Amino acid sequence: MQVMVEGKEMVVTPGLQAHAQKQAQKITKLSKHVLAVRLFLETIKKKSNDPTANQVTYEIDIPGNDVVVRAHAADMYEAIVKATDAARRKLRKLAEKQRDLNREEGLAAS
């Protein structure tokens, strides 16, 4: 499983890279089916304390689906944490949906 962190119109510092990698590992622990995780960090040129100045986009490759999650925050570290939480919720929801479908198929077959 590979994790890629890229900056759009910004330089990704080693501290930011380490934080993003650590957060992405939380996603990979959630599901064994995650093939790849791409993190795009972007700073939007606006006012200094704009709550949407920093955007983080997760692209998560899983069999059958690609999950895309975005989050905004005034601080890049906070945006990474928000995006990670949103991605974890979305993956849990997909896993639960798949379990329900498998359960229904098992009941219908018997």
What do the predicted segments below correspond to?
Residues 1-110:
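N-terminal, polar/charged subdomain of small-to-medium soluble alpha/beta proteins
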